[in-house]
A protein has these predicted regions:
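RNase H-like polynucleotidyl transferase catalytic core
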Residues: 32-39, 106-122
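Acidic/histidine-rich, metal-coordinating catalytic segments
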Residues: 13, 82-94, 121
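C-terminal anion-handling pockets and recognition modules
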Residues: 6-7, 123-179
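RNase H-like two-metal-ion nuclease catalytic core shared by retroviral integrases
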Residues: 88-90, 111-133
Length: 179
């Protein structure tokens, strides 16, 4: 069994926050005036949504294996006690030898989801919600973009809403291990 009593369980993934990804949709019979931000701002994001630990978010310039290793160190610093089990997709960075070695050194177990199954990772729902928040915000600088993404991330992770359906579906008899 992978999950043991006292383990911390989290979900990790990258996303690119962009002020031009508008996720708002609506029907209207009247002619609407569309407000569009023409500034091109982007922030790479790595996030770790913990079910029973401290969440972590980072905004690296790149998302290469070195950057992901640094992020794993941050996750460990935020969660210094116990083994950490992280669910990750099959992004090449997550499977890099350097990343696997660093995870092993930090007592972090990386559990890879099946290919083409982003719906199994609750953090994907967080990214979608954060992009929605960004799309309706007036943002003029990269710092504002990062602040909006960070605030949205911690607000959403505090409620566990992204994992509400995941927990009973996949953890049913293991939930007591996380307490």
């Amino acid at each position: 069994m992978i999950l043991q009593k006292g383990d911390l369980l989290g979900f990790v993934d990258e996303s690119s926050q962009n002020i031009n990804s508008n996720t708002q949709r609506l029907w209207s019979f009247a002619k609407l005036k569309i407000k569009k931000n023409t500034i091109h701002l982007k922030a790479n994001t790595i996030g770790c949504f913990m079910l029973n630990g401290i969440d972590t978010i980072s905004f690296p310039i790149r998302t290469k294996s070195e950057d992901f290793c640094e992020f794993l160190v941050e996750v460990r610093q935020n969660n210094p006690v116990g083994r950490i089990c992280l669910l990750a997709d099959n992004f090449a960075t997550h499977k890099a030898k350097r990343v696997r070695e660093k995870a092993n050194e930090l007592n972090i177990i990386l559990i890879y989801l099946p290919p083409y199954s982003p719906d199994l990772n609750p953090i994907e729902y967080l990214w979608k919600s954060i992009k929605r928040i960004i799309s309706i915000s007036e943002i003029d600088t990269r710092e504002e973009l990062i602040k909006t993404a960070r605030d949205g991330f911690f607000s959403l992770t505090a409620s566990l809403s992204a994992a509400r359906m995941w927990i009973p579906r996949f953890l049913y008899d293991k939930l007591d291990l996380l307490c």
